[in-house]
Amino acid sequence: SMHMLFSGNPGTAKTTVARLLSQVLKEEEVLKYGHIVECGRQDLVGKYVGWTAQIVESKFQAARGGILFIDEAYSLVEDNRTYGAEAINTIVQEMENYRDEVIVIFAGYPEKMKEFLEQNEGLASRIAFHLNFPDYSPVELTQILDLMLEKSEYRMDERTREKCFSICADACREENYGNGRFVRNLLDHAIMRQADRLIREHQN
C-alpha cells in the first residue's frame, strides 16, 4: 500500500502537494483517475449509531482510483462523546479493503499526528510514507509572495519587497503564524489598501 502521513503546520502546502501527487500518480498509472476527495472530522462522523461506518465507506467509494485526503484526523478521537472511534476503526478496515484502489493521506499538526498514531497502532502499521512539511523561512515566504503577485499580475518595487521581507521575518517568530496563508492574507490586505487608495484619489 502507499498510504501516507503529511505532518506540518497550517499553510505549509500539504493539500497542494496531495493534489499534485494525485496527478503524478495518475500519469504513472498508479492511480486510475487521479482525483482527490478531501474531508475532515465533520465529513466522517455521523449523528447516530451506525451512520459513521456508512459515511466512511461512502468516502472510500468516492475516492476509488484516487486519493482520500483526511485533514486533522486526530480530531476524530479528541471528543469522546462522538462516534470518532467508530470512524477510525472503519477507516482502518477500509484501508485494507481498498488498498489497491485508494491511497489515504492523513494530514495535520506534527505533534498531534504523532500522538494520534501512538494511540492507533493498527492505523500506524498501514502507513508506508511519512512526509514532514517544515515551516517556511522569511526568504521562502517572500518568494511565495513574488509568485502570488506574478499570478495576480502585480509587481512590487525593491523598497516594498524589503518591507514585506521584514513583515515575514516578524511573523516567523510567532507560533502558528499561518505560513503560506499568512502571505495570502498579506497580499489580499495590500490589494484592498491599494483599491481604497485609488478610489480616494479618483474622488479627489
What is the meaning of each model-derived region?
Residues 4, 37-39, 68-69, 104:
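Hydrophobic positions in the central parallel beta-sheet of the AAA+
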Residues 32-35, 65, 98-102, 123-129, ...:
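Short glycine-/polar-rich loops that comprise or flank the Walker A/P-loop
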Residues 12, 43-45, 74-76, 109-114, ...:
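Conserved nucleotide-binding/hydrolysis micro-motifs of P-loop NTPases
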Residues 39-40, 63-82:
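Conserved P-loop NTPase "ATPase switch" module shared by AAA+ and STAND
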Residues 74-124:
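Conserved catalytic/switch belt of AAA+ P-loop NTPases
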Residues 28-33, 115-118, 124, 133-177, ...:
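Conserved C-terminal "switch" segment of AAA+ ATPases
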Residues 33-63, 85:
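Short glycine-rich substrate-engagement loop in P-loop NTPases that contacts/grips substrate
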Residues 2-34, 58-62, 127:
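Walker A/P-loop
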